[in-house]
Amino acid sequence: GEAQLEKTLELAGLRRGEHYDAQVTIKDERGDRHLPDFVIRLPEGKNLIIDSKVSLVDYERAVTAETDAERATALEAHARAVKNHIDALSAKDYANLPGMESPDFVLMFMPVEPAYIEVMRSQRELFNHGYQKNVVLVSHTTLMPILRTVANLWMIEHSNREAREISERAGD
């Protein structure tokens, strides 16, 4: 999931080290270490956290199931795995770590689009469950507009900085 997410970040026009970092170690007030998958930098010192570690083992079992009953059982397990990951991610409280200046939510990236679609189709309440826990489920398709918005914010920030510099030089 992490490699696919990084490709998605790059496709959106974001650059590692400038617009985002991977596997950043952050310590909380107690000194405990946290390791979000990706921290997306936003203008004005803000950050957005994306996690990409959701298990797709049960979804793969559903895809290869030989009977409808096996498929249904595997899809139920897939939905439980996604819900459990939402709950675990929410408990990490990444958005409130010191220095994060993050919105009060984390994006949970599901790298396999059909796995995302299936869980959204069969467990409609799961998105709301995540939202209430400050975890927003995203796939490549739903994440891309968010990342393009971030890239556009950086272009505007860069243009504004250049305009200020030109204005300051003109005033000298």
Task: Report the location of each language-model feature.
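Amphipathic, heptad-repeat alpha-helical coiled-coil/stalk segments that mediate oligomerization
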Residues: 1-172
